[in-house]
């Protein structure tokens, strides 16, 4: 399956059409596989998303010992894409869509795209 030319627009368009057809407030993630520095194998990641808080900033929240977190940001859309990748497969499984139900996370209109996960070149440890 080929990726859309504009994944960001496509995620929004798919979400709007399915929301209208199903009458449900849903989120969309378009994913692809990638390699990672210092790790073997590929993993799914969120190429684009819509109606989903893609990055969850937990700075200031308490950890399991009651200590405040200082720099924890969760790549929430990537975590969902990786989980979906287990079901979609990476070769000839031909399962291009995974539905995740019962996820109790808030929808987010402003921080709603996986492009928000791209970090500045100056903060990137691998460039």
Residue ranges and their predicted role:
Residues 1-45:
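Internal active-site segments that recognize and position negatively charged phosphoryl groups
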Residues 26, 30-127:
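A structural signal for small-residue-enriched, beta-sheet-centric alpha/beta enzyme cores
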């Amino acid at each position: 399956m080929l990726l859309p030319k504009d994944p960001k627009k496509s995620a929004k368009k798919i979400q709007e059409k399915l929301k209208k057809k199903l009458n449900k407030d849903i989120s969309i993630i378009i994913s692809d596989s990638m390699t990672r520095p210092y790790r073997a194998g590929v993993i799914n990641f969120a190429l684009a998303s819509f109606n989903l808080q893609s990055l969850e900033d937990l700075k200031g929240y308490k950890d399991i010992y009651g200590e405040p977190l200082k720099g924890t940001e969760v790549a929430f859309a990537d975590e969902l894409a990786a989980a979906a990748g287990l079901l979609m497969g990476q070769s000839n499984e031909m399962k291009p869509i995974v539905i995740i139900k019962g996820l109790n996370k808030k929808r987010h209109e402003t921080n709603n795209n996986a492009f928000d996960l791209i970090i500045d070149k100056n903060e990137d440890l691998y460039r």
